[in-house]
Amino acid sequence: MFENPDTITIDEKIILREFVETIPTSIFGPDRVRYIADNADKLAEGDKLALRNFVNKALTRMIESEASDIEIGGRGNEGYIWMRIHGNKERVRDLPQFTEDESALIIINLFNDNQKQHLLSKRNLDFSYTYFYEKRKINVRFRADAYFDLDTLAMNMRLINLSVRPLSSLEFHPLAVRSVSHNYIKFGLTLITGITGSGKSTTLDSIIDHHNKFDPAHIIIIAAPIEYVHTSNVSLIKHREVGRDVLSFKDGIVQALRQDPDIIVVGEMRDPDTIMAALEVTDTGHKVFSTLHTSSATESLDRIIAEVHPSEQERVRNRLADVLISVISQKLVPTLDGKRVMAKEVLIVTPSVRAAIKNNNTSEIYMMINQGGAQGMITMEQDLKKLYMQKKISLESAITYANNKTRIQQILSAK
């Protein structure tokens, strides 16, 4: 059980209260956050450690509650710590409440000087956080984002999986697994897509782990931040964190070409420069994996093309058609037992798909996926039906999570 919050926080509350009392009453809003950032280092080392230990205890609670995310601070939290447990955001009512200033100090105490300056200048900070989970005697990593909520400081921390799921457990068609294998295809682009929290990183890590166990390659991972840290096995794996080891995704991709890679993993194709660099690097005989915040294969193709300047779109469309290998789009759907299961759409690029991309007929691709089961493809609706027939998800969830509501109802009613 998690320790009683009334006994674990008495010292921390005193530390927080005494610090907050030093904040001049004449300053308001973001200036209060700046004051906290400028003066947090004046805390005694023991006080800093006590506040960090409180965060670690809250993270332990998060792990043991099977939560994926924790939220600390910000006006919207109303003093509570919130967690996302099996997909649902919930107040944790038996943890202590904090004022906005107290929460800001708890958050800022996690940062070094460079991170504080980045937060204050950019109004946002992506970072990773690691602590030692005593019960399992392992280091646990979190992806974190600090941001402002109506001039108050807030933070989300997302648990990075303690272990990597075997690629076989994700139930891809053997031909889909073959498409991501460096041993089978030496160069080209594979996209893993989905909304935030859909498990993209889990799938990407499973693919990396598969290479690390069975498919030797030199893999360079460029991410912001680095999440799961892979230990080299049959593959040599390097991790480059944006803002820490390299200045940008584009720089990381360009520099990787001088580092003798076989596979380059780009954490996210979030801007035109990164998209162009990722497409061009496949010209040099490398395999690229990356992610997008899109819900379907066709939406992913349209998004990439729309991200670049209109004068470049025709060239990018042709380049994408030439280098794209596969697109995996996924969602996490509530299960009947209160957990979540991955539903997926898989596009394998065939000559017909390639022609549709080049001719700007991406609307035709859905039916190609629908009819491409023998080639390893599956639509989101087909996979949702399969999960429903396996009695893993409800009918309501199958319809709710479908990209094409009309199509899901048609295939669910078919004999």
Question: Language-model segments: what does each one mean?
Answer:
Residues 2-5, 10-14, 18, 28-415:
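Short, flexible helix-loop junctions that flank or precede catalytic/ligand sites
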